[in-house]
């Protein structure tokens, strides 16, 4: 079973632990989410809890969004996401709120976000290729290089100029350093995908017990 919450990336800072260790953390605003819909295996083919985060003015939302929010007795939301096979309580129902207290300090989580978009970029910036000689006699400066000996064909996976960033990425096994229930904030060790003020999804780690299980097997 999975527990999760939606949030907004605020930025990065650093905190000291009780041992005096300086830890870089990402601050994530997890203002209580509203349960917009509860999906069941019988009605929808899978079980999930749909959460809504960050209020949006009704002027900026269409009629279906307003009607969907009205069923949960709340305002339209900017960010809506699903938590599959959610473990948020047996009596969870539409209109309930999910807050930061579902997590505890020391837990590991997986954070999913959208990376920064860089637009159309060349190979040097996008893929980290080396440039050619910059002398006047050189005809190769910042080109992608040879496409191979076969004419009229580009091999699959060839690194060429194109769009960079703006992809959905998940960083796994990040530790929660602090849970601030009063301010609805999570402090997560390390960095997470996306720019400041971008939306993220936080779920309990799928690999939380991998190292422990492997160590037990090796000891046997």
From Swiss-Prot:
Gene Ontology terms for molecular function: rRNA binding; structural constituent of ribosome
Pfam family of the protein (one): Ribosomal_L3
GO BP, sorted A to Z: translation
Residue numbers spanned by region Disordered: 113-143
GO cellular component: cytosolic large ribosomal subunit
Keyword list, A-Z: Ribonucleoprotein, Ribosomal protein, RNA-binding, rRNA-binding
Homology family: Belongs to the universal ribosomal protein uL3 family.
Assembly, per entry: Part of the 50S ribosomal subunit. Forms a cluster with proteins L14 and L19.
Protein name listed in UniProt: Large ribosomal subunit protein uL3
